[in-house]
Regions:
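Inter-helical turn/loop segments and adjacent helix faces that build the functional surface
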Residues: 121, 192-202
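Short hydrophobic/aromatic beta-strand micro-patches
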Residues: 55, 190-192
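Conserved small/polar residues in nucleotide/adenosyl-binding loops
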Residues: 209
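Terminal catalytic/cofactor-binding subdomain
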Residues: 2-175, 183
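Short, conserved phosphate-binding/catalytic loop or strand-edge motifs used
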Residues: 181-187
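Histidine-acidic residue clusters that define the catalytic metal-binding segment
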Residues: 178
Length: 209
């Protein structure tokens, strides 16, 4: 029978010190990463990613195959397709990239711009291409935080191994992981900062929204 040694107070203290050291290392790594992001104000850019739900006339999610047809329809000569495991899952050009989230949410990632006005112009140009194509397939996009029409379990995952693995993991871990993957859409904004105080000020301002 193995010799089982009871943990002592000294062992517990050592364990706590190791945990604190790891915690401190993580904090230092985060601070170092944020400091590397300091930029001069004349180099400031702003970036944005917008995720959309794509619905048909019955308020059902379009799904990968229909959105695939739309993507092929709107791709121009200068657009470069992005394939993964033989499946088209997006395309990109100098102004933006188009990709699909786990349950076929359509995402546009606009290249960093000097002003919000530039971002708006690029997004409007994209919608002028996208919306007519959607209409031809009796589809539309909506910008909700959560799918208001369907449960997460009803929504299929696109053919991407990483999402399949994530989906399996979330079936066993936590309670809302699959809901996050399949039934949510978001807007993500990236803002440059010059120093720690500038970063704090902008972060607090963003929290107001």
């Amino acid at each position: 029978m193995p010799n089982m040694k009871k943990a002592t107070a000294s062992d517990n203290i050592v364990g706590m010190r190791i945990d604190m050291d790891i915690y401190r290392m993580n904090i230092d790594a985060i601070v170092s990463h944020l400091k590397r992001g300091f930029k001069r104000s004349d180099d400031f850019k702003i970036g944005i990613e917008i995720e959309h739900f794509v619905f048909d006339s019955n308020d059902r999610s379009a799904g990968y195959e229909k959105i695939l047809d739309v993507m092929k329809d709107i791709m121009g000569e200068d657009d470069k397709p992005y394939y993964l495991e033989g499946h088209l899952i997006g395309f990109y050009n100098d102004r933006y990239s188009i990709s699909l989230e786990p349950a076929s949410q359509l995402e546009i990632s606009i290249a960093p711009c000097a002003s919000a006005d530039e971002l708006v112009c690029i997004y409007r140009d994209f919608r002028r291409i996208l919306d007519p194509a959607l209409s031809r397939y009796n589809l539309r996009v909506e910008c909700y935080g959560y799918n208001p029409y369907e449960s997460a379990q009803e929504l299929d995952i696109i053919p991407k191994k990483r999402y399949e693995y994530m989906d399996r993991y979330f079936q066993k871990a936590g309670t809302r992981g699959r809901n996050m993957m399949r039934a949510t859409a978001s807007v993500q904004v990236s803002v440059d900062y010059s120093d720690e105080n500038d970063a704090i000020r902008k972060y607090r301002l963003c929290l107001l929204y």
